[in-house]
């Protein structure tokens, strides 16, 4: 089973923390939709032997498109690929785009999962992050969306300056009041060349506090696990049967094609990525050329990726797989590097699977980096 990711590189405005590829100009929107459809067709040979299980619209802001545009792209996938009968089709959306009419229209055009960028239910947080929606729109869209969609995920951000533990718990409680079956939650991070980075440098916004983010993370984990959510990936929580099939395929090393500017693809042997420039992308597709670069993954690259994705998920890192796929030298190296984390109760081994402990979960990315960064070839 495989997946198709379609990047919609447009947003109404730039969130202060975001460094993803997008444009706030919609002048090339129609041309982009046609180019995306054309790339889907141009790349069908890559997936001729694959069964498509998921279609995911990310961005940017996919909900900025007309539903007819999204429907055209979905139909193009169905016409050119082998797709299972009921694939998971996810559209990332912002609350300000989700009127009742738009929600009903999406539900009537094969979309069966919404991923809604709530981020916070508090007005001051939304203004600090320069989100396009307000608190009332966040609540209203969930009130309506839950009437038409069973499978909904929302994004929440923690570690926001001025966010107390009590305020964070209120955000979680508000989200749960809508009976949402999936929550993705991330610490606010400062990326170079973002407005947030500039504001912190100038002292307009206080520096982020890692300890606060750490506390918020554990409050979230404790609260959601108490009521039956499964913490199946570092930033993702789902009720049983509501895990994101699309994202799970990335973490489990399945093949996927990325369509659109800046989108990445992976087939188990090499990784490729499209140019992060809308004009260059459109020009290349118009010339029937794929605007991508390719990197063949070495054994060490694949080992490192497995360590990173494995430690972020409930599936962990299989020591048996490490030895079978990469060899005893890699396994010996892994066990040597892991010893200090095992002794510090940050990692544990169960049934030949290496996993982070509750204490180690928040630190899993840092732990993973200590387990790779090597070249044994």
Roles of regions detected by a PLM:
Residues 9-20:
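Local cysteine-cluster metal-coordination motifs and their immediate loop/turn environment
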Residues 1-8:
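Immediate flanking context of iron-sulfur cluster ligation sites
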Residues 328-342:
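Short amphipathic alpha-helical interaction segments
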Residues 353-357:
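Minor-groove-contacting beta-hairpin "wing" of winged helix-turn-helix DNA-binding domains
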Residues 1, 22-45, 50-328:
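C-terminal scaffold of the Radical SAM
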